[in-house]
Amino acid sequence: MFSMTQRSVRLFSTLVFMALLALAGCQSVPPKGLTPKQIAVLKQEGFELTDEGWAFGLSGKVLFGSDVETLNQASTEIVQRIGKALLSVDIQKVRVDGHTDASGKEPYNVQLSVRRAKSVVKVLTQVGMREENIQLRGLGSSEPVASNSTAAGRTENRRVSIVVIAD
């Protein structure tokens, strides 16, 4: 039989063990995501927070002509500026999403959207981003931001978005 002292010691030991287990489960996890400085730069450059991350291009700043896959000079300068700004705050991983309007057949539009995304990736690598840190997607006409029934809407849909994912 256990004496009262032995029971107290055993109970105390059990409580200490349970407290240590609870504390081990409460260890803080290193912070993930973006720093306030990185978020400030993203906002300054015109990125908007979306369900998929911080996206640039929703307001139609990197647009393409109909059936065109190369960036014009103004869009090239925008992508260069963005790439340099991201690197200046140690954002090194992005996703580049190419888009088209709904004109033409979808298999062709997907290929065209990939080529558009590649043209942006090329500029980003020229300013110092590593190609292996850039995910590329060609989405064709699957994610329009405007109606394809008007010329203005189709113009808005011929675009590339740059997305920063905080992980």
List PLM regions with ranges.
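Periplasmic peptidoglycan-binding/anchoring modules of Gram-negative envelope and division proteins
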Residues: 38-43, 48-49, 63-97, 125, ...
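Envelope-exposed proteins and targeting segments
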Residues: 43, 52-54, 58-60, 67, ...
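Short, small-residue-rich loop/turn micro-motifs
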Residues: 58-62, 90, 98-100, 138-140
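N-terminal targeting leaders that direct proteins to extracytoplasmic destinations
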Residues: 1-53, 69-70, 77
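Core alpha-helical elements of the protein kinase catalytic domain
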Residues: 24, 84, 121-122
